């Protein structure tokens, strides 16, 4: 603050009074007063819930590793690179590995995701932006119902209803594009339904209903503003709806991938077992992590046999964590780009 010059007094100059200094106000994120007992209890409960979730995840991983180590110590093969038949009956010389399980799990999940997400995007945009209200409501209910159907129903439907209908398409793809490894003849007849092709389509149906609500949350004011500026309906969707729902679409895609990675009952019913190595063909059979463990559930009375399958479960657990971490990173990156 600058003091006025005494020489200016009486000289006809207007002297402004000095402005008072603004007081510094500290802001307490928990309020201006001391947190009460109820506030402290709520904070402890919230922190405890977060710690409990982390502790449960760590406990699951530790349990799986603890049960798997004895079996891994008796394994005569490289657990990560062996893809042959599992031999766990002789616990003194066990042979098991996850290479084939990992390949089948990732392949069928990515195939299902590639089929499901474009369809899910189209369904979501149609229901939220184009369909009349009297039609959008019932259709949205039917789409959401896809996520509520039990897996065993999908499995039976896929094997006995969908697979016979896919036989002509499978035969045509094999005949026309059989030179490509993706459509080459697999480990069994192409016209049988127990293949990755059938299982992936069933998985795609199961994970379709993951993005509809994301696009339904777009501000209607933004859409109306775009239309008022002369944009067509598609231009409004492209400039407002799609950018708004991009992050949710990415996270929904990874959520669908996570569900596909862990799907058990439907694929256990559909996929045929095989003793051949996985050839990366859509017309191969095989086992995923989940179906391998579920199929051997009745033989897990021995700690070493159980340990072999729990080791596979540990790998599936870690794979799921990695996928979720990638989803989180992609979601954060997409939001930053959008901003």
What residue spans do the PLM features occupy?
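C-terminal transmembrane helix and the adjacent membrane-cytosol boundary/short C-terminal tail
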Residues: 212-223, 227, 254, 295-339
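Membrane-interfacial helix termini and adjacent extracytoplasmic/periplasmic loops
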Residues: 74-99, 155-205, 283
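Transmembrane alpha-helical segments of polytopic membrane transport and secretion proteins
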Residues: 1-49, 327-339
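Transmembrane-helix boundary motif in ABC transporter permease subunits
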Residues: 112-143, 327-336
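Membrane-cytosol interface at the C-terminal ends of specific transmembrane alpha-helices
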Residues: 121-126, 181-228, 232-235, 240, ...
